[in-house]
Amino acid sequence: MNISIIPTGDEILLGIVVDTSSAYILQEFIKKYPDCEITRKTPVADKTDNIIKAMERCVASKADLVILTGGSGGGHRYSSTLSEDYTHCALGEYLDEFEESEIYGSNGHLWCKLVCGRKKKSLVINLPGPYVEACAALDAFLEVYDPKEIKLSQINQRMIHAVYNQYPNTQASYIK
């Protein structure tokens, strides 16, 4: 199995935030699939075109699985001072087919969006930026992932519920 990890976000690219999720992804995949080949790509800036190009390179290199970590949230829908959701825009634009789910807070703001889909023969998923949420989503993915029978909806639902369970009951309002 050939796996590519693409960390996204200006904060990771510039070294403002340390990418701890990639190390966890590597560790967990090596535990479950000791013969897999994993490559962590150079972090990608928050620009839709850059993220699409990074995914294109991974798919062209015949990656079985492409994992994007972090990126921008959906806060720009509520405040123009918050950044655009580049990672999810890129996923929606690039993938041939996909499933997506969102978690909203009691204030109505988007807290998390997870996408899993296909491009050619590659499965592409994203993990949230916050480490605890990323670990929960990855653990859920690994529980349900079967390289021989990929069910996008099942993968997406398992991952989003795992992330939802990381929030206190009084704060996370609903899953869409």
Language-model segment annotations:
Residues 1-176:
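Non-catalytic beta/alpha edge segments that cap or flank active sites
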